[in-house]
C-alpha cells in the first residue's frame, strides 16, 4: 500500500468516527419510484368512516404502494367502499385495475379502531383475503403499513417492508439527534439527542434495540438503546476507539472495531457488555464488521492486502479459519452489508474519484454499480432485500437515497426539509 493510499484509508476510518451529518431539522420523506418498467395497476377505494380520523388509512396504503415503485394507483373515486360490499370486479378491470381494495374503519366502545379490508384479483375475479386489525390514534399509520405489506406480498410474492422502521442521524445547530421513523420517514421520534456526534446506528434482529456510537464522553463509545423502554447502556468503552457495532443474528453478541492495542481490530462483546474477545490478529486496519444472516461469517474491511478490501472470516475469528478476500472489482472497497437472504453483498467502491454503491452476487462474484450518485456511503438493505438505503450527496448537502438492489431503476433521493441527514440503517421486519 502506498503512503497516500494508507493515509486515505486511515482518513476514511477517522471520518467514520467523527462525522455525523450537517444541520437538519427534518421530516424524512421516503420515495422509491420508477422501479422497473412494469408496475402493477391497483385501485384502493376510500375506506368507510375515515372522514374524521387523525390518520386516513386509505391515504397511507396508497402512498406506500406508490412510493415502492412497484404499483400504479388507479383512480378509485371518492365513494367509500366497505369490505362487506358486493363489488363488480369486471368493472374495475375495465378501468385498468388488476386488483381492488375495499375496507372500513370503525371505532369501538373502548376508543380503539377496528380496521378491516379485503383484496381482490380483478383478473381472476376472486378474493385474495384480507386482515382485521386493531389500532389506536397513534397506531393507525402502522395499520395502513401492514395493509400495504399484505397487498405487496399477495400480489408480488415478496414480503413488504412498509411496517419496518428507519434510523438515521440529523444535526440541528450544534445538536445531534438519533431518530427512528416509519419506513416512509413519517412519525419520527428522537431516541437520543446530544451535543456530540452520534454514528453507526445498527438495529438488533428483533427490531427493539439500536446499537450506536456516541462521542458524548469525548471519545467513541458503543451503547445499546432499548426502544420500548428508552433505557440505554454502555457496551464497549475500551481504551482507544470503540466503533462500528454489528449484531449477531441471535442478538446475543456484537462485533465491534476497537483500537485497544493500536491498529483497529475486530472483536466481539456480549450484548450485556461482557465477554470481550479478539477475532482478528493482523498488523493492518480491520474494521466495519458485519455478520452473515446465518451467523457463520463476519465480513469486514481491511487494508491487509495493500488497499482497503472486503474480507470474510468465520464468526469465531481467524483462529477458526483464515480470512478470505471477497471483493476484487476496484482497488478500494469498504462498508460491507450482506442481504437478508445472504446472497448479495452491498459495499462502497472508490470509482473515478468518487464513491459508488456496488452490489455483488456472493455466489458468482459478479459486481455492479447500482447508483448514479458518486459520494455514496453507509449502505443498508431493506428487510426483504429488495432495496438498499444509503447516504450520498445531492445539491451540495448530505441526503439519503434508496435504490432497487438489482439496479433496475435509478436511486431516488429521500427528501429532508431544512438540512442534511446521514448514517441510515433500515430496520428488520417487526416481530
Curated annotation (Swiss-Prot):
Cite the residue spans of the region called Disordered.
Answer: 406-431
Supply the alphabetized keyword list. Answer: Cell cycle, Cell division, Periplasm, Signal
Q: Where is the signal peptide?
A: 1-26
List the record's Gene Ontology CC terms alphabetically: periplasmic space
Q: Give the record's GO biological process terms.
A: cell division; protein import
Q: Which domain of life is it from?
A: Bacteria
* Location(s) in or outside the cell: Periplasm
Query: What protein family does this chain belong to?
Result: Belongs to the TolB family.
Q: What does this protein do?
A: Part of the Tol-Pal system, which plays a role in outer membrane invagination during cell division and is important for maintaining outer membrane integrity.
Q: Describe, as the record does, how this protein assembles with itself and its partners.
A: The Tol-Pal system is composed of five core proteins: the inner membrane proteins TolA, TolQ and TolR, the periplasmic protein TolB and the outer membrane protein Pal. They form a network linking the inner and outer membranes and the peptidoglycan layer.
Name assigned to this protein:
Tol-Pal system protein TolB
Q: Source organism lineage?
A: Bacteria, Pseudomonadati, Pseudomonadota, Betaproteobacteria, Burkholderiales
| Gene this chain is encoded by | tolB
